[in-house]
């Protein structure tokens, strides 16, 4: 069952300007150390940051709150599997909100997709609730260790 859907579009040039203007103050407020390390080793860091910005916005919308009600930027984090597939991880109040919206007996899976085509970066997040039996039938979710199951 679908619990939430969120999407966001970010302007890479706007994120680049914010990075130039505020530097580490902006990076450290919005992005985890892991997200910063990935962005800084890429040829176009601003595009990587913009995709992660959009993913956090999309995730907050899928959680049904937007960036309010106590959800902090760093409560949502994007990492990549070895295959390059992005994975959304939630902690803090974002995790609490996810647990609140997940029905008893179900686990939540957060699906995220990212893309960019200069000057735009886009993210879409779908939060799905699965029973343990349904999760076992879904090899596309990968190993249980990478799932955001409640």
From Swiss-Prot:
| Reactions this protein catalyses | apo-[ACP] + CoA = holo-[ACP] + adenosine 3',5'-bisphosphate + H(+)
Task: Give the protein's cofactors.
Answer: Mg(2+)
Tell me a GO biological process for this protein: fatty acid biosynthetic process
**Subcellular localization, per the record?**
Cytoplasm
- InterPro entries xref list: 4-PPantetheinyl_Trfase_dom, 4-PPantetheinyl_Trfase_dom_sf, ACPS, Ppantetheine-prot_Trfase_dom
Supply the enzyme class, top level: transferase
Supply the EC number(s): 2.7.8.7
Q: One GO MF term, please?
A: magnesium ion binding
* Pfam families in the cross-refs: ACPS
Chain sites annotated for binding Mg(2+):
8, 57
The UniProt similarity line reads: Belongs to the P-Pant transferase superfamily. AcpS family.
Matching HAMAP family: AcpS
Q: Which NCBIfam families match?
A: acpS (TIGR00516), pantethn_trn (TIGR00556)
Described function: Transfers the 4'-phosphopantetheine moiety from coenzyme A to a Ser of acyl-carrier-protein.
Protein name as annotated: Holo-[acyl-carrier-protein] synthase
Gene for this chain: acpS
